[in-house]
Amino acid sequence: MVKTRAILEEYKTYVPGRSKKEIAEEYGVAEESIIKLGSNENPWGPSPKAKQAIIDSIDEINRYPESNHEYIKEQIAKYANVTKDQVIIGGDGADELFEVLAKTVIDEGDEFIVHQPTYTYYEYTFKQSNAKAVYATWNIEENKLDVDSVLNNITDKTKVIFLCTPNNPTGGLIPQEDIVRIIEATDALVVIDEAYWEFSEVNNVNLLKKYNNIFIIRTFSKVMGLAGLRIGYGLSNPDFIEKMSRIKPVFSVTVPSQKAVIATLNDEEFIKESTEKAITEREYLYESVNSIDNIHIYKSKSNYLLMDVRKTGYTAAELTSKLMSRGVIVRDCTSFVGLDEYYIRISVETHPKNEKFIEILKEIVEN
């Protein structure tokens, strides 16, 4: 038998949202009729300019992609209001950059602080580097970070602190004054995950001008509509970006991905419309679910919302199964540490599909 790392004996596989194909096969529903509310995607699709850029790039895919990404960095810097030497680009959405971060800053025995619940990939990635997770608290009832639970856990071993704003899966924001309290309390790297910032219409880029211990991470998978191309970017001080770049995979961002990103960033109207439509549908979902007895839904500043379904008489797994049997994919949040077995996350779809989801949800929980 091949010998593997001891850590893998207790390591759990990351659980992503489920695909239409999976649900169609498992529940016997037509794939084309499925309503997908489980993965926080852009349901309106990518920019037409991005589609054309991908088509135009086909004749280049026999060549290795550009590795230094200078032109893309210029475009991202313009969009993010930073300089290009503050930008790093990664494949696999933002997830590759989490792995590069761990390789850049973590030595065995170091600690990282992560609030719960939040995006589980932080812990999944950093534990691979033999770092120890230390848990802070996200107050579910108030949908906000317990800042003191972060501050009280900072020690000499703390290397990284993760802050997700808007928080996934709750949709709550972390006020900038709370972020500053944490930054000023430590010399550890404070990672601010802004994957969904466009939907909140606020960000923390201005802090880069004052503080060097910040890394802001973003993705093109959400409002930009490029989830299938897997590309993200990070923002920090130039020295830290240069050190990360030394160990980042060289050719992880494909030619079609690079062309699509440039085209999308140059389509300001698409970004604006995608953001506005998602916010409109988010508020529609909130008001509609909020009118259903026995479901508590949390206000959100992202393109998803968290529901507490305990009063329906169903667990999240049970209600998720019933919805999937009707062709609706939602995210059972039982796997999120910090949540119990009664939470479901839903993300926005087109308006007709959101209406159909509400109709099906009411039929299930009100009968």
From Swiss-Prot:
Cofactor(s) this protein cannot do without: pyridoxal 5'-phosphate
Keyword terms: Amino-acid biosynthesis, Aminotransferase, Histidine biosynthesis, Pyridoxal phosphate, Transferase
Xref: Gene3D superfamilies: Aspartate Aminotransferase, domain 1, Type I PLP-dependent aspartate aminotransferase-like (Major domain)
EC number: 2.6.1.9
GO biological process: L-histidine biosynthetic process
Catalytic reaction annotation: L-histidinol phosphate + 2-oxoglutarate = 3-(imidazol-4-yl)-2-oxopropyl phosphate + L-glutamate
Modification sites for N6-(pyridoxal phosphate)lysine: 222
Pathway: Amino-acid biosynthesis; L-histidine biosynthesis; L-histidine from 5-phospho-alpha-D-ribose 1-diphosphate: step 7/9
One Pfam family linked to the record: Aminotran_1_2
KW Transferase (keyword) present: yes
Single GO molecular function: pyridoxal phosphate binding
Oxidoreductase keyword on record: no
Family from the record: Belongs to the class-II pyridoxal-phosphate-dependent aminotransferase family. Histidinol-phosphate aminotransferase subfamily.
Protein name: Histidinol-phosphate aminotransferase
